[in-house]
UniProtKB/Swiss-Prot annotation:
Protein name, per record: DNA-directed RNA polymerase subunit beta
Functional description taken from the UniProt entry: DNA-dependent RNA polymerase catalyzes the transcription of DNA into RNA using the four ribonucleoside triphosphates as substrates.
Gene name of the encoded protein: rpoB
Keyword Transcription in annotation: yes
Organism: Syntrophus aciditrophicus (strain SB)
Family: Belongs to the RNA polymerase beta chain family.
One GO BP: DNA-templated transcription
GO molecular function: DNA binding; DNA-directed RNA polymerase activity; ribonucleoside binding
GO CC annotations, alphabetized: DNA-directed RNA polymerase complex
Domain of life (superkingdom): Bacteria
Amino acid sequence: MGEFRKNFGRIEEILEVPNLIDIQTRSYETFLQEDVAPENRKNFGLQGAFKSVFPISDFSGKCSLEFVSYKIGAVRYDVNECIQKGMTYAAPLKIVVRLVVFDTDRLSDQKNIRDIKEQEIYFGEIPLMTEKGTFIVNGTERVIVSQLHRSPGIFFDHDKGKTLTSGKLIYSARIIPIRGSWLDLEFDSKDLLYVRIDRRRKMPVTILLKAMGYSTEDLLNYFYDVEHIFCEGENFYAAVDESLVGHKLYDDIRDINTGEILFKKGRRINKVILKRIREQRVERIKMDVEELPGRILATDILDPETGEVLFHCNEALSAAGIDVVREKGIRELSVINLGEDLSNVSIRDTLLIDRMETPGDAIIEIYRRLRPSNPPTPDTAQKFFNSLFFENESYDLSTVGRAKMNYKLRLDVSTDVTVLRKEDIMAAVKYLIDLKNGVPECSVDDIDHLGNRRVRSVGELIENQYRIGLVRMERAIKEKMSLQDIETMMPHDLVNVKPVSAVVSEFFGSSQLSQFMDQTNPLSEITHKRRLSALGPGGLTRERAGFEVRDVHPTHYGRICPVETPEGPNIGLIVSLSTYARVNEFGFIETPYRIVKEGRVLPEVKFLTAIEEENQVIAPADQPVNHDGSFKGDLISARKGGDFVNVVPSEVNMVDVSPNQLVSVAATLIPFLEHDDANRALMGSNMQRQAVPLMRPEIPLVGTGMERIVARDSGAVVVAKRSGIVESVDASRIVIKCESAEKTDRDTGVDIYTLIKYQRSNQDTCFNQKAIVNKGQRVRKGDIIADGPATDNGELALGHNVMVAFMSWGGYNYEDSILVSERIVKEDIYTSIHIEEFETMARDTKLGKEDITRDIPNVGEEALRNLDDSGIVRMGVSVKSGDILVGKITPKGETQLSSEEKLLRAIFGEKASDVRDTSLRVPPGVEGTVIDAKVFTRKGAEKDHRSQYIEDEAIAMLQKDREDEIRIITEAVKKEVGTLLQGKQSGAKIVDPKRKKIYLKKGDIITPEILSEIPLHLWKEITVADDEETERAVGQMMANLYDKIEVVEAYFNEKTEKLKASDELPPGVIKMVKVYIAIKRKLQAGDKMAGRHGNKGVLSRILPEEDMPYFKDGRPVDIVLNPLGVPSRMNVGQILETHLGWAAKGLGEKLNDMLDSYQKGNQLRDELKGIYQSREFEKFVDGATEEETYQFVRKLRRGIAVSSPVFDGATESDIRNMLKLANLPSTGQAILYDGRTGEPFDQEITVGMIYMLKLHHLVDNKIHARSIGPYSLVTQQPLGGKAQFGGQRLGEMEVWAMEAYGAAYSLQEFLTVKSDDVAGRTRIYEAIVKGENTSEPGLPESFNVLVKELQSLCLDVELIEEE
């Protein structure tokens, strides 16, 4: 049924959907570089982490520890063993390091190598990723979520006018490295420029610039144009050069020939005027002396005679100063040009408030500000300053950061330079000043642009953890080097792996980004692996994140899904990767586009990041195109720079790959998504992830074509690794004999797939696989051979297709409630299996050992009937709450016995009172069947009968695998050898010495009958007369066979050894037992159900089939929904799905009616072709036999599957045509009759098939009741919540309600005996037992708590009770 879906999509698929968990697997592969030879490994990932810390030298430089290579060993337990035993799936990591010891020549100060010691060291275990992109940590499956954070680089921003009341913009810049100190540049209200290092106190930026070695003069010359003024006698002249541009003319400019005025005094000079002035051969222009006061000097002015400084640079000239200049006969002045409106004064003014004279002073000032407690010395201050931004060890801008900086500041620096340079900081300050002055080329950055946000995937996150651990280890190594004698030391004496292992295991166990995998169904697994989070270490926090960060941004198109995100406080902070998106090596998200050249769309595809996409003009995927690839139409709606524009075809240079590249996997599964309101689509995508896998899954009649892809990539189904023929198949395994082309010498050519049976998932849903191939069937590589949970025939099947009517029915669909037919419960359509795990441990306590046993004191035989001899519940037993699962006794503390008791005890050996019953019992609300029990025993402890039985069962399974594998390869070789030997003459006699039987005489003709009698171990002795080549071939085949059998035997023995070995248990635990109970949950009132369009509701009533509204032909509908749930919610997609679903169901029935009424042969085929209308399908029908066609049609009895891809789905006319084909009313409505009265309803009612899901919010998990139970110690009130077996809180509002009704006695009872009146509780219990009807409420305990609290505040409060 799922093999062919009628597809309504009009756009052909250009690019296959990439593997959906690629983001996880690729990232971890690049991190490990496991398959790369050590010498060829690139400097990132694990290799990069080691290289960044090694070599480690001691403080005196006498020795150095160098890193050579690492290798990853073999895994000890496979994935399933780790899950069962609660282990971490990890492999040993070994590193090769060498210790180099130097001798220093005292005279020449030269270092000579004295000694080199190289050694391989065990470096802890490194967790490995499973094929499904998850990690197994302590037996639970976890996912490392990728983090979306701000990319390193430089960012310019302003405060949007919020700081100052005047609304003036205050600009700032920030340089963010991957590792190291942040550098902030910011203006204040007076336009002074300040710098902050690591968000500490701000200081004038010039302190930092001076610390880098720039003098005041250098700074003025760098940031300003300098004018040269000559002084001759009483007059001053300005040099004619570039610095005059933008200034007013100091004097009239006349033509040298005619003397007429070309430019009047006061005219503003631009480049054209400057050129004309130079043409007049004017070299200087006379200035008015009044122009000079207030001009700022660009250099110091020295006395020509004494050399003393008359005026410092950055000083303003005064009228008196001009007189001094004339007096001293100074010939030339340099002044700075502050711009026409004197706006560019930031650096000049900042220099005025900065008191630093020399770079040394500036460095010490910075050290003082960042390290206030340490007294500075010039040396330490200099070292500290260099380490802030200029050294690789402490500062790393990363290649991404350097590239972004080059792009923004228009620099041309190699991306290998990952530290800051002085020039970078100067360029940043210059850009910030230009930005403030409104230079057109400068712009602020949008931090929500995906060019400024990058993804840290698993590999990078774990690499960072290794770095942190290695840096801690480095300190310890340096100390050890200085303390111990280097001559005798070996590398392993220095390296202690504990700090590294601790950091890595802490990350996997408790980091915010390492999450317990959402395993409700295959879709929730895939979505969890594709999730991007802005939270986590180094990211945002929920409280601080504003609206902008959460909002959808134009650059999200095709990269991040605009629909799928959680509702609530995390909205927009946790998002999902779009279907075709991928993360590139720098961590930026790319999306694919088809290239357009000269107006023609090419099949070539290119992936672009958000920055690369900025200047492209991109047409949508559904833009009509002619056969030659040129666009239809004169104007095309396209995207350019985040906006929608209409352009001519020649301007377009890219086209979207597919209409669904915009949304994520979960949203792609919603048919008619384009007709749903985005809020409802969001709920729809989120609720599909909560759908419980059903006992009998069914694929959706109306799908989108993505169902098969999701099922395949999720890892829930079993995919054939190689092509071959199914040799045998049963409920728990599939054996495939591979085709010869795929075999290698050591390979047996047999693939055995063990299916997962009834395993508990992280969310207590049932993970079960069942084979969908038959014995003798041929399978191709990549075919799906077994279905998993929530999959049907290799497609995702989260729910069921049910017949729905949109109408009101007796108020049972008020507020989105759902009315359901009893047929659905009867036929187990929405029945699901849930598996709960209960465990208990027998520990070694101070008072003695606990024991797991059937012999429990004071428990009757009735309660023990389900336990076996070992005290563990039997398989297949039905249990309910309170039943014993595992019998366990714990020693009690010794009580002081009287001498009589001691005597009695000595005589009768009475020991039972020394132990108490601590058995594992079924908790309240659980009722089901025991499906499995696992027993783990400590080393040295004896295995009980149950453990032995479990072990024998597992070994028998392995034995069966071994026998099958050996049988298949032996038969294959026997067949090949038989064909070679048949009809040949035997060259020697074949005798079985044990049985003394002659099988072949020399010279006999070899026949298949004779060969079949000869035992396998004698085949190698068969020789052929006069045919050496055949003999050699046979010998080679037999040798290969024995090799392969040896491999199989070795594998089997290794597995058996593992099974027999004792288990690693936590300290102090002797034995651990896990019991698994399967609970069958039928649909019942209170369960939550939903469609795929955000149409959710709670089941209000299960109605007998005969009362449901029914069609004219007597068929009742399955579900009744409220029609008012559609218009206000604007999810019209569900109505279109209803119509199309009805048509699909109707066509399936029509075809089967044709089959039943013997309309076979061509008529049936033509009908099929008319429905599917696809070339591929026609080929299939024409090639199929009559019987195959009938079988195919029979499968369609439930309806024909159709796919309506997102944004390219079925149109209204398509749906009408389908309804007509199925002979159904084209309105999609029908007259229904009331099941209670048989009367028709007034109007026609919209009916059809909807795919409905049962969600994980089941009423059985939520309903809870308590009479007596645990109480809080302080307040003596009942605890709260189902988990604590708590009571219902009676809050203020409830008290008011009781008061309003005057229910005084009930209220008094609520607040005293039913809550915290301890004495009253006991009294009322006694009264109930005796059958009396008295109630004496006393003083609530909370009153005493209040009194004590007041007394603790030194208020003397006491209650005086009257007698």
